[in-house]
UniProtKB/Swiss-Prot annotation:
Molecular function, one GO term: catalytic activity, acting on a protein
EC number of the protein: 6.1.1.15
Comment block on domains: Consists of three domains: the N-terminal catalytic domain, the anticodon-binding domain and the C-terminal extension.
Protein name (Swiss-Prot/TrEMBL): Proline--tRNA ligase 2
GO biological process: prolyl-tRNA aminoacylation
HAMAP family hit by this protein: Pro_tRNA_synth_type3 (MF_01571)
InterPro entries (alphabetical): aa-tRNA-synt_IIb, aa-tRNA-synth_II, aa-tRNA-synth_II/BPL/LPL, Anticodon-bd, Anticodon-bd_dom_sf, Pro-tRNA-ligase_IIa, Pro-tRNA-ligase_IIa_arc-type, Pro-tRNA_ligase_II_C
Main location per the UniProt record: cytoplasm
Subcellular location: Cytoplasm
Gene3D superfamilies per the UniProt record, alphabetical: Anticodon-binding domain, Bira Bifunctional Protein, Domain 2, C-terminal domain of ProRS
Length: 481
């Protein structure tokens, strides 16, 4: 490796030396994001936005398959609307950004820049809904929201972020509950089928649930450093908002009733999760299904023989199969530089083709996830690479799943709890009595929170990890982003 090529890679801090700096190096040096002039805001650059577009495409297809429609609601919400649901405003008030002037004129009422849209959407639903025949309302919007965060990190926690938020109304509580779980399953599929990111699905504790909701469900992923990342949430809101906003409909008996309400969302923090699940000290490692560029072809000695003719054929064959492929035929960079750059950008597959390869009717195929290189026959190469995508996805998923399992501890008491956090940072499975005071004490003493009560419960005993009282709920706890 030439000196400048080696330096190119060494510009990324090693994650074992300084994990936060490693993350910052990866997201900036791979051109995903840049810092905006306003603290806590980010510019998502084309390569980073392409990742979000892939996620959008996956979710949008799933939403529409179940009858959901996209729409758009205003950015600004009158303060009086925000105040209508007491728990909700209390939960979001510290993070709200306020508009107080229109031009040079002070507004009669402050307007908040949406931190989430329940209040404005419910206001409109109250205006529109008349009869049970119109239900369910199945609406989703793609937008940005603003939450004035004190401590920020691009993608993971920013004052403005991109997301989708679904808001639905239903005739019965059972239908609303079914909707809530259905959308959580969409997020689970997004993480596991597109991002190769294993997640634990479950219900949030009362103290961790959405402000103004009855029940919140979540998917939690483990990052390289053992911390949890909440990767998508779905809320059963009951009738809290529909009563507060006087949303009524004529039911089947002709009586006025309040519908049942859900909301659910996933955001660009998933990009941060993707990076911290798979990437390494050389840069990004992207699963093929979400990678903006799935294959890069690097010609070797491009001007010799029929190298470029062969490259063009491989390119055309891959394009015909819907593969996102690029040819790097820049003549002002060395081959080594090109290899390092594409590895840093996380392109899943690199195809190298030169005169000797053509003589042998083969190409060299490099996998970014394993850093392994093998020869493949030119005949049927495009099909072989498409098959390889599935192998890479499954291998990456399994590697992340094993990392989670290897860094999950089972504990029975607080001594074991503290020891596990110190010796093997990661998830902790334990029993909890359901008392919010025990939950708060654990957080205060260790910094770990209940990430969820998993749907897949395990019997780990009958005593609460903190107080020793009778317990019948297994929880997953961790420090979290």
């Amino acid at each position: 490796m030439a000196k400048n090529e080696k330096q190119f890679v060494e510009e990324i801090t090693k994650m074992e030396d300084d994990f936060p700096q490693w993350y910052t190096d990866v997201i900036t040096k791979t051109d995903l994001v840049d810092y905006a002039p306003v603290k806590g805001f980010m510019v998502v650059k084309p390569y980073g936005y392409a990742l979000w577009e892939k996620m959008q495409e996956f979710m949008d297809k799933k939403f529409k398959e179940t009858g959901h429609k996209n729409c758009y609601f205003p950015l600004l919400i009158p303060e009086s609307l925000l105040n209508k649901e007491a728990e909700h405003v209390e939960g979001f008030a510290p993070e709200v950004a306020w508009v107080t002037h229109g031009g040079n004129k002070k507004l009669e009422e402050r307007l908040c820049v949406r931190p989430t849209s329940e209040t404005i959407i419910c206001t409109m639903y109250a205006k529109w809904l008349k009869s049970y025949r119109e239900l369910p309302y199945l609406y989703n919007q793609w937008c940005s929201v603003v939450r004035w965060e004190k401590s920020t990190r691009p993608f993971l926690r920013t004052s403005e972020f991109l997301w989708q938020e679904g808001h639905t109304l239903h005739e019965t509580a059972e239908e609303a509950q079914e909707e809530t779980i259905q959308q959580l399953e969409v997020y689970k599929a997004l993480c596991e089928e597109l991002l190769a990111m294993p997640v634990v699905a479950g219900q949030k504790s009362e103290s961790e649930k959405f402000a103004g909701g009855e029940r919140t469900y979540t998917i939690e992923a483990m990052m390289h450093d053992g911390k949890a990342l909440q990767s998508g949430t779905s809320h059963f809101l009951g009738q809290h908002f529909t009563k507060a906003f006087d949303i009524t409909f004529a039911d089947r008996e002709g009586n006025l009733a309040n519908p049942y309400h859900t909301s659910w969302g996933a955001s660009t923090r998933l990009i941060g999760g993707l990076i911290m699940t798979h990437s390494d000290n050389r840069g990004l490692v992207l699963p093929p299904r979400v990678a903006p560029i799935q294959v890069v072809i690097v010609p070797i000695a491009a001007k010799k023989g029929n190298v470029m003719e062969t490259v063009d054929k491989i390119y055309a064959d891959l394009k015909a199969k819907g593969v996102a492929v690029e040819v790097d035929d820049r003549d002002n960079y060395t081959t080594g530089w090109k290899f390092n750059e594409w590895e840093m950008k996380g392109v899943p597959v690199r195809v190298e083709i030169g005169p000797k390869d053509i003589e042998n009717n083969q190409a060299m195929v490099f996998r970014r996830d394993t850093l392994e290189k093998d020869s493949m026959p030119l005949e049927g190469l495009a099909d072989a690479i498409c098959d390889l995508f599935d192998v890479i996805h499954n291998d990456m998923f399994e590697k992340a799943r094993k990392h989670r399992e290897d860094n999950t501890s089972i504990v029975e008491n607080m001594d074991e709890f503290r020891k596990a956090l110190e010796e093997k940072p990661g998830f902790i499975k334990t029993m909890w009595c359901g008392d919010a005071e025990c939950e708060a004490k654990i957080k205060e003493e260790t910094g770990a929170t209940i990430r969820c009560l998993p749907f897949e419960q395990e019997n780990l005993g009958h005593k609460c990890v903190y107080c020793g009282k009778e317990a019948d709920s297994m929880v997953v706890m961790a420090k979290a982003y």
